Amino acid sequence: MDGHQHHHLHQLQYLNKHHLHTQSQTPEIASPVAVGDRFPQWSVEETKELIGIRGELDQTFMETKRNKLLWEVISNKMRDKSFPRSPEQCKCKWKNLVTRFKGCETMEAETARQQFPFYDDMQNIFTTRMQRMLWAESEGGGGGTSGAARKREYSSDEEEENVNEELVDVSNDPKILNPKKNIAKKRKGGSNSSNSNNGVREVLEEFMRHQVRMESEWREGWEAREKERAEKEEEWRRKMEELEKERLAMERMWRDREEQRRSREEMRAEKRDSLINALLAKLTRDGSL
């Protein structure tokens, strides 16, 4: 058993122990609404808490059939955060979030964030999931994860939940314990594993193409916005330079006018002084006679 399988087994044992401990000490809490009634609306804080808890357990969800136990663990963690939600409510809310996220895949990131406020949180979970698969592919076998399990990792989460629950029911059916049927299923599983590997590779390639396309569109949008911003900034700078030139011209004109006015006043003052001096000289001559 390698380190990855050991970690996964340890995590399942912890979750099972936590589930049994909770059942032994905590009485069954009824759903906040009766069957058939509408679930109470989820708040933004409550939804973010659910996404965070579900993201922490995402790898375990992808590698185990006992999702019912995991949803009960999520429900208990939500109650610990003062959000009394039943496992079924958490599961339904997660399916709705996945559906909305998949509906935003063809949009630009900025538009998706405006229409779906939890886009970044969901994107982080799915990107991390794909990175794990890429790492498993590069290791040449997925660390003990079967081809069918890897294929389910990239199917929709709605299908994943139903498939895992059906697998649990089938494994408990006595009719399936027929050895001949088990041998036939194993032979069929070999071909399914090969097909699953091809399917996983196609999904990975499509995902990478989608990522490259999204990054290219984002880069083009960013460059267009940057170009528009630079053009507006250049236009604003040009207008400011024109206004500065106009201000300097007006100031120069005002100074010229002010100098002309002072020159005229000085000339008038000189003429006035000359006239007064001439008049005084005349009066002096007349008085002496």
UniProtKB/Swiss-Prot annotation:
PROSITE patterns linked to this entry: MYB_LIKE
Subcellular location(s) of the protein: Nucleus
Coiled coil residues, start to end: 223-275
Biased composition (Acidic residues): 156-168
CDD domains tied to this protein: GT1 (cd12203)
Alphabetized InterPro entries for the sequence: Myb_DNA-bind_4, SANT/Myb
Skewed-composition ranges (Low complexity): 190-199
Keyword terms: Coiled coil, DNA-binding, Nucleus, Transcription, Transcription regulation
Residues covered by the Myb-like domain: 42-98
One GO CC term, this protein: nucleolus
Sequence motif: Nuclear localization signal, positions: 179-188
Induction: By salt and infection with the bacterial pathogen P.syringae pv tomato.
GO molecular function: DNA binding; DNA-binding transcription factor activity
Keyword presence, Isomerase: no
Assembly information from the UniProt record: Heterodimer with GT-3A. Associated with the mediator complex.
Primary role: Probable transcription factor that may play a role in the induction of CAM4 in response to pathogen and salt.
Record protein name field: Trihelix transcription factor GT-3b
Organism: Arabidopsis thaliana
Taxonomy of the source species: Eukaryota, Viridiplantae, Streptophyta, Embryophyta, Tracheophyta
Gene: GT-3B
